[in-house]
């Protein structure tokens, strides 16, 4: 790698010595890279706005295959302002970026995942439902962890309509007529499976049209947690924070209105 430029999204930053920072950026052209930013704590550093958490920009610098890369300048800086300023949205955004960091190796070229991440953060920044946005991201990201469940139809007969449950034995969904084939299936709420099947293929442009009751969201969360525990094995601090946040969320904000599912 050499001098060049690429779009990128800040994954995280951490202090390095007294005045400098290490900044991990998910770049569109080179994958994930760790950058050294000298003098990052100086208030007059022109790079400062471009290396804040939840920022997307075009980054110009020395991109290296080994060791640290170096940032020279930036342009077209676009902060995800609502994510930066809202603790609740910030929590979901942090979790999404942590998932990205865990899902692919550094320097792995994945422009599709870059675009998907951009769309997820944009939807969060537009204050669309953060739980639904995150659930969609989790389900569609499973493939990056080598997990490819069959969500579209019953793995036994090809049925696409009706009630379904997830079977680890068959790596996909079973329709109600074939639940007897796996006594160890998830026994998940059929409504949760319905939405997870939808999330496996829906685009973020249609998120605003998805309405889910709070009790169903809870079932979806439990089912996705089962999938990640079984297949991925991640235990991210940002996910734990979201789980804890749900217990005190209603004391800090107005409870959401009841919604009709569709």
Swiss-Prot record:
SUPFAM superfamilies: ArfGap/RecO-like zinc finger (SSF57863), Nucleic acid-binding proteins (SSF50249). GO terms for cellular component: bacterial nucleoid. One of its GO terms (biological process) is double-strand break repair. The keyword Transmembrane helix does not apply. Signal peptide: none annotated. Keywords: DNA damage, DNA recombination, DNA repair. Pfam families: RecO_C, RecO_N. Belongs to the RecO family. Involved in DNA repair and RecF pathway recombination. This is DNA repair protein RecO. The gene is recO.
